[in-house]
Curated annotation (Swiss-Prot):
This is ATP synthase subunit delta. F(1)F(0) ATP synthase produces ATP from ADP in the presence of a proton or sodium gradient. F-type ATPases consist of two structural domains, F(1) containing the extramembraneous catalytic core and F(0) containing the membrane proton channel, linked together by a central stalk and a peripheral stalk. During catalysis, ATP synthesis in the catalytic domain of F(1) is coupled via a rotary mechanism of the central stalk subunits to proton translocation. Its main location: membrane. It comes from Xanthomonas oryzae pv. oryzae (strain KACC10331 / KXO85). F-type ATPases have 2 components, F(1) - the catalytic core - and F(0) - the membrane proton channel. F(1) has five subunits: alpha(3), beta(3), gamma(1), delta(1), epsilon(1). F(0) has three main subunits: a(1), b(2) and c(10-14). The alpha and beta chains form an alternating ring which encloses part of the gamma chain. F(1) is attached to F(0) by a central stalk formed by the gamma and epsilon chains, while a peripheral stalk is formed by the delta and b chains.
Amino acid sequence: MSQALTLARPYGRAAFAIAREGGTFAPWSDALAFSAQVAGDPRVAALLLNPALGQEQAVTLLAPPQAGEDYLRFLGVLADAQRLSLLPEVAGLYEHLRAEAEHVVKATVTSAAAMSQTELDTIAAALKKRFGRDVDITTAVDASLIGGAVIDTGDVVIDGSLKGKLARLQSSLAH
């Protein structure tokens, strides 16, 4: 996986540079998400390895209908370098660079039960205060947490779940 990220990094940076230059962050995000989802399908991944599939056909297969010329050229460069399989990693790197440029922290809040909008607003305000950036929250529900929530911002994980607290208590009692 780390090798894929290393190989994808220059393409993620290039996509970001093109989008920044054109002021088209959102369309590039949408296009990369589409292409990454298609390329991530095992059947499509196998098809991309087929030498009978031409580069133009591969680009057509992976490009969203609304793709602009810059994006099609970008896919062509990936096809020329035989790096179309890296699209999921390229999309992830692009989103990371975009969030940095827009001063946004992406956080995933996983809780034992669905959270109210008021609770999410409170968490968003606390994270904004801590990181000094706007917060984009994605939610998930995992009943195995028993109670509480786990907040993952990529670099920082805050485990306030009952499951996590019990695990820490068990660890401290064992030692």
